[in-house]
Amino acid sequence: MNPPAAFLAGRQNIGSEVEISTIEKQRKELQLLIGELKDRDKELNDMVAVHQQQLLSWEEDRQKVLTLEERCSKLEGELHKRTEIIRSLTKKVKALESNQMECQTALQKTQLQLQEMAQKATHSSLLSEDLEARNETLSNTLVELSAQVGQLQAREQALTTMIKLKDKDIIEAVNHIADCSGKFKMLEHALRDAKMAETCIVKEKQDYKQKLKALKIEVNKLKEDLNEKTTENNEQREEIIRLKQEKSCLHDELLFTVEREKRKDELLNIAKSKQERTNSELHNLRQIYVKQQSDLQFLNFNVENSQELIQMYDSKMEESKALDSSRDMCLSDLENNHPKVDIKREKNQKSLFKDQKFEAMLVQQNRSDKSSCDECKEKKQQIDTVFGEKSVITLSSIFTKDLVEKHNLPWSLGGKTQIEPENKITLCKIHTKSPKCHGTGVQNEGKQPSETPTLSDEKQWHDVSVYLGLTNCPSSKHPEKLDVECQDQMERSEISCCQKNEACLGESGMCDSKCCHPSNFIIEAPGHMSDVEWMSIFKPSKMQRIVRLKSGCTCSESICGTQHDSPASELIAIQDSHSLGSSKSALREDETESSSNKKNSPTSLLIYKDAPAFNEKASIVLPSQDDFSPTSKLQRLLAESRQMVTDLELSTLLPISHENLTGSATNKSEVPEESAQKNTFVSY
């Protein structure tokens, strides 16, 4: 066994041990971070409960303060009135004191007079006792006389009524007698002339007597009718008084009802004004939330840009060191195969290598999908002419202004956005030469450049896998085993790695398949959001984001010297949440088949079955969130703002449609099943 081969094998073992140790450390860190996140969630929940209690106590204190202020204002008014009363009373007291002094002098005089009067009072008391005895006797007599007077008055009233009735009868009789006397006189004057008509006059007399009797009977009846009508009038007066009282009561009730309606209208106006204020505050908070989201995204981009630029710088330094070490080790082989290589050529190679890196970065920023593989071919030809048999590894992650502008766009512009970055660069690894084609020297040259930059490649691959959620993917752990890998780093970083050997010109294969190209990935985001959807966002839920292929991935090529296939696996990055209504309709239109077993599973495991010739399985486990983000403080602030918005919306009692929430649980993440690749979903 050659010494460089043993050295390379030792380095591979060291690299695998380093990988295992780093993976274990990362797992421990992940577990610690998950524990910390759970503790912070508990603390946040406790803080929210305490905050709600404080708000309730603040409202109660505020009401108490308002009542106390009203009482204070009333008491101050009463104090002012009483102070004025006290002042007036003090003036009166002073006047009374002066009067009291005068009264004391008068008292002394009156006391002397009282002594004199007391003697007189003793005499008068004796007289008064005698007079009281007389008064008692007189009072008894007065009582008896008053009783007799009452009886006499009653008799007098009865007699007066009888006299009045008799007077009326007498008056009527007098009138009738006067008439009769006149008639008798006339008859006396006419007797002489009409003795013959006596019979007729007698008859008329009898008729008049009968009429008198009838008239007397009618008068008695009319008196009885008058008495009945007076009693009826008294009853009607009592009813009128009672109706007036009822009318006053009804009028008071009407006034009370009018006042109640006025107060209800005032309360409604107050409630409307409060609703408008809360709506305006909600609108402002939503704008603040959108601004914070955009700022957070921009900061995330800046952080990731800085991290990846640092990684680029470290990888370049490691590449330069690795190239120096590989050149020192391969000098003997190069001299045996190509003795005409000069030191000037190596210097030119260094300068051209650096220039071509920056040219490749600029070219890849401005080219589209179709020119990606052609670009790799052109670079391959240039490297063949310039470098000879030296292998070149270029690893670059490019961040452009277009990506930043795309991420700054608000999510609410469309229900489903298909993000196709302009900087579409595929990761292509060219075949190394198998040991059957050439000799041992060429074999060593092919192994050295493929194994020296393992550390830098692993770091880059690990960063890409963390961003895509592929930390547990076996392909991300061993990128050097695959010949062709066409992967995207979702919208942010894209890696191009072209590995080439001069001796293996006949069997070099390029990644011409377009199934794993970034244009075939669709990233679905929430669209226009209503009030109900704002509620579902502001609740502490998780966001769903799906990256999937437009069509089945068919890119797979064989490796010279190692019997392994690199089947293109579908990348699905899932961040768990209840998806919004606008994004659900877009999901249903694009995805034709969905598995019924994935309704309640928070994460999904995609197992891809390879061709039956090799019976190899590649499983990709996708984590829900990126736990390595350095912007935890901003995320906490966002969570607090979300909680505040939910509290406000719950206080305004906005309607929450349960249908959207239940529908989001059923239509979570859907993945098409392809019979050719035999994909199976395992939910856990």
Curated annotation (Swiss-Prot):
One of its GO terms (cellular component) is nucleus. Transmembrane segments: none annotated. It is found in: Cytoplasm; Nucleus; Cytoplasmic vesicle, Secretory vesicle, Acrosome. One of its GO terms (molecular function) is nuclear estrogen receptor binding. A motif (LXXLL motif 2) lies at residues 650-654. Keywords: Coiled coil, Cytoplasm, Cytoplasmic vesicle, Disease variant, Nucleus, Repeat. Its main location: cytoplasm. GO terms for biological process: blastocyst hatching; cellular response to estradiol stimulus; estrogen receptor signaling pathway; positive regulation of transcription by RNA polymerase II; spermatid development. Residues 594-603, 659-669 have a biased composition (Polar residues). Contains 2 Leu-Xaa-Xaa-Leu-Leu (LXXLL) motifs. The first one is essential for the association with ESR1 and ESR2. Nuclear receptor coactivator that can enhance preferentially estrogen receptors ESR1 and ESR2 transactivation. Also modulates progesterone/PGR, glucocorticoid/NR3C1 and androgen/AR receptors transactivation, although at lower level; little effect on vitamin D receptor/VDR. Required for normal spermiogenesis. It probably plays a role in acrosome formation. Interacts with ESR1 and ESR2 in the presence of estradiol/E2. The interaction with ESR2 recruits CCDC62 to ER target genes, including cyclin-D1/CCND1 AP-1 promoter. Interacts with GOPC. It is linked to Spermatogenic failure 67: An autosomal recessive male infertility disorder characterized by globozoospermia. Affected individuals have a normal sperm count, but spermatozoa are round-headed and lack the acrosome. In addition to pure globozoospermia, some patients have a mixture of acrosomeless spermatozoa and spermatozoa with small or detached acrosomes, which is defined as acrosomal hypoplasia. This is Coiled-coil domain-containing protein 62. It comes from Homo sapiens.
